[in-house]
Amino acid sequence: MVAGLPARRSRLRPSRVRLVPGSAPAPGLGQRGRFRLVQLAVAFFALCSLHADDEVPDFQENYLLGDWAGYRTTLWERGINPEFLFIADPYGNPYGGFSQGFTVYSMFCADLKLDTEKLLSLPGGEFHIGFAVNFGTQLSQRFIGNVFPVQSSDVAPPGPRLTDLSYTQALFDGKLSLRAGRLSIDSLYGEEFAASEYFRAMTSVAFNAIPFAIFYNSPGAFGYPATTWGARAKFAPVEEFYGMAGIYNGDPDVGLANRYGVDFTFNGPPFGIAEIGWKRNQRKTDTGLPGNLKIGGFVLGGTTQKFNSDSTGGGRYGLYLVGDQVLARFGNRAENRHLGVFGSLVVAPDEAVSPMPYYFGTGLVAYGPLDRRPKDILAIGLAYGAYSSRLRDVRQTQQRTDPPIKPQSYEMTVELSYSILVVPGFTLQPGAQILINPGGVPSTPGALALGVNAVVSF
């Protein structure tokens, strides 16, 4: 979030129009009046926007190339914040799936954030433009056949695309955040809807970055790097509570790989999502163990073809619950070393249109499990998704005349991984995933996936 200037009292007074004796009042504001309105608008944003100390980020601590010989700090002081991220996932399945194989799938992301206070004297604002390209071969699609992608970069098909093209404005000391433009409901940096920092400790897309079933049940929900036109508002009247809601263009064709993120059409149907959240023990003065609880719902407008008939039904909808809780602290508290638990639940109850009506995920994450490795992360998680009974009935009927069609029951992923901070800005996360009922098909052999998730922040 962009920091604003210290609070200032506005010295602006209402505009006065001088009249020449015998003349009529000016029909409009005039140039001077319009300029004064612009001044008043800027003053309003200055008084309402977030106010905080302007601290220089620790570039040496967070990026492989550090401060770029001082150029990064210079850019930041001028309101320009570039971000570069590279993710590579060399993974293979020595057992199970359609067949055995090894692939590397990767994603490169470039983002530019512009601080409007430093550039335009408008506190609390941020322009964001982003680009991403995925390349390589997706292990889950090519060799295993599971729905929960193994590789963390397997969030989009191969190809380049424009990602974010948005503006965010913070108002009222950061209590209100407004965002509009080309958006997704999750975020590469920070958090949007249905998020938990614990999800990012996992490699499998079943967990990371938000529960997979939200996207699977609602094709109008866009997740990074796919974006669509939308607007989001978040209001946090106190530190412990917030509410947020967003409305987006839910046309799934906008996110197709061959549109490259530049399909700016607005054909709908609308996709809406809303969430309320509670934060526990997260003030600087709190001594208890922190936790989060989030409850939300989503709906895709329009009509949807029902699985078990030629008729159409209403839009898809669902509810979700996300929570995490620190269980124990260890070591130096300033290092934020702790053991925590997370959980998520997604219910899309209309089985006539929702392919995975029930999903849950849970796990344990240890941040800094070893005294000598305070930045390493040990994680174990389980994700389960149950397929629609209506869809299963349809496929069982179709299988009688078309044997290759396979009815789906459930799919489950169990992951164990250990993230190693090699140097600042470069992590290696070796991991193992057990994949049960890949694609929800019991006849597909369960698989074991082994590999490494490599992440470089430049």
Language-model segments: residues:
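N-terminal periplasmic/intermembrane-space "pro-region" immediately following the signal or transit peptide
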Residues: 2, 41-89, 93, 117-121
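Transmembrane beta-strand segments of Gram-negative outer membrane beta-barrel proteins
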Residues: 57-58, 72-95, 127-129, 137, ...
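Short loop/turn motifs that connect adjacent beta-strands in outer-membrane beta-barrel proteins
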Residues: 66-82, 115-127, 172-175, 240, ...
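Transmembrane beta-barrel strands of outer-membrane/channel proteins
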Residues: 82-90, 127-133, 178-182, 243-249, ...
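Outer membrane beta-barrel
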Residues: 101-217, 221-252, 353-361, 366-394
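Long, well-ordered mid-to-C-terminal structural blocks that present hydrophobic/aromatic surfaces
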Residues: 281-373
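Outer-membrane beta-barrel "beta-signal"
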Residues: 446-458
